[in-house]
Amino acid sequence: MPPSLHVTFLCHAATHAMKTARFPTGDEPPAYDNRAALAQRFAHFDGRVIASPAPVARATAAWIASSVETSDAFSDIDYGRWRGHAIRAIADKDPEGMSAWLTNVDARPHGGESIAMLSERIANALATLVHDDARTGRYLIVTHAIVVKAALAHVRGDPLESIFAMDFAPLSSITLDYDRQRGVWTVA
């Protein structure tokens, strides 16, 4: 097992839902083809590429590597009955629910997953990676911005509420390193 682990989280490409301020449906393709930029950016990546099962994440990952694994652990948060709906329409129809969603990590006004539930799932996924015996110890996880936020809050030990103040653009990335000897995560 390598002495350290390097996990790069990459936010998937933009989707039409993102461009039109809608909650995702989970089956959106990328709105633009960004393969040239990503191929150059990750040309020398030599680890495992793991994507959320969402088509946009799988397509983004396929622009980088010919061999891509998928993992439900890195799926988008479950937006429940809000899937596919315009954010403004939900805010108008259910202002209390939207307010709770934007301020309370345990809120699930849509009937799906709360931020706290997502964060627990991501913490478990990171623990699984820590115990993986991959030869390179390098991972590229292509996923959703909310998943990246949850991972960052977890490794930094930040309160989950910090997720509300984070913003990750499509195709932005962050690398998290884990020192197996010290048992410590750091933001690279």
Predicted region positions:
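Active-site signature of alpha/beta-hydrolase-fold catalytic machinery across serine-
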Residues: 63, 150, 154
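Phosphate-coordination/substrate-recognition cap region in phosphate-metabolizing enzymes
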Residues: 37-98
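Loop-to-helix element that buttresses phosphate recognition and phosphoryl-transfer chemistry
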Residues: 4-60, 110-122
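Generic beta-sheet signal
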Residues: 7, 47, 135-146
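Short glycine/proline- and acidic residue-enriched helix-loop micro-motifs
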Residues: 97-117
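Domain-level recognition of soluble alpha/beta enzyme cores
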Residues: 159-184
